């Protein structure tokens, strides 16, 4: 027991030391600049809200798509050519099992022939080269087939005096998947960004995911009680600043909603109208 505890302590220290080295290594981020402005036009960001459960996303064929977090658990995932996939919250890398599990799901379940660029937090760099991560599922060879990019973020763009959205440097926009993926889309050069499955941005608020069998409509007060802080107030502040930042760049962010909900902050379009018009 003592040996196991000591080894865990060593792993923890090594992990945090590696994270600090990665964050301070400008070369890890500098290479991201090859993606800056590489795209144009429309992009569709696929989040994991329960509103996407059961929907046929075949109409997205041929379109530019960014997916995030555990969208790979959707039964639609292997039908789509994903251009970019992001898992950027650093807590995902606190344990080798988490990173191995997520990357294996993303890579093994993807559409045959699809080669998305995989965006990870710089803290993942410590693990990618470790044999322990790749022992069971041959992730190492799969990762070599993908374009892996690392990002680092410090601060919160909503509170800081400026938005640091240059992903080839230390930014302040990776404060959650909801926000990072929009800033990623802008960094890539897209001018029209559609949000699908971003259920926390809608009213009424529905919690749950496309990959589970649970959905619940809750009030702002109930969400605050669950989280222990004013989630709605914080996310609304971030969303509004992000909307204003995008507008200054002539970028439109459009929330795709069902007919029984509305989008208080973002411009919106009904899902059925968008999908049937494609």
Language-model segments: which ranges?
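Metal-ion/cofactor- or nucleotide/acyl-coenzyme-handling active-site neighborhoods
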Residues: 1-278
């Amino acid at each position: 027991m003592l040996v196991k505890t000591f080894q865990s302590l060593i792993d923890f220290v090594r992990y945090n030391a590696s994270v600090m080295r990665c964050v301070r290594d400008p070369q890890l981020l500098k290479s991201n600049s090859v993606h800056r402005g590489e795209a144009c036009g429309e992009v569709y960001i696929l989040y994991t809200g329960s509103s996407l459960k059961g929907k046929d996303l075949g109409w997205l064929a041929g379109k530019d798509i960014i997916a995030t977090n555990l969208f790979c658990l959707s039964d639609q995932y292997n039908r789509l050519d994903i251009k970019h996939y992001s898992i950027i919250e650093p807590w995902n890398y606190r344990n080798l099992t988490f990173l191995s599990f997520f990357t294996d799901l993303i890579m093994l379940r993807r559409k045959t022939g699809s080669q998305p660029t995989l965006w990870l937090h710089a803290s993942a760099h410590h693990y990618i080269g470790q044999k322990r991560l790749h022992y069971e599922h041959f992730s190492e060879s799969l990762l070599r087939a993908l374009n892996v990019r690392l990002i680092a973020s410090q601060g919160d763009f909503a509170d800081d005096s400026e938005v640091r959205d240059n992903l080839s440097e230390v930014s302040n926009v990776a404060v959650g998947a909801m926000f990072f993926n929009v800033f990623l889309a802008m960094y890539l050069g897209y001018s029209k960004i559609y949000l699908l499955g971003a259920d926390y941005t809608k009213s009424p608020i529905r919690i749950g995911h496309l990959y589970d069998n649970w959905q619940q409509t809750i009030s702002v007060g109930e969400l605050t009680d669950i989280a222990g802080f004013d989630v709605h107030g914080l996310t609304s502040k971030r969303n509004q600043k992000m909307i204003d930042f995008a507008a200054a760049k002539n970028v439109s962010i459009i929330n795709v909603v069902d007919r029984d909900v509305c989008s208080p902050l973002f411009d919106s379009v009904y899902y059925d109208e968008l999908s049937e018009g494609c």
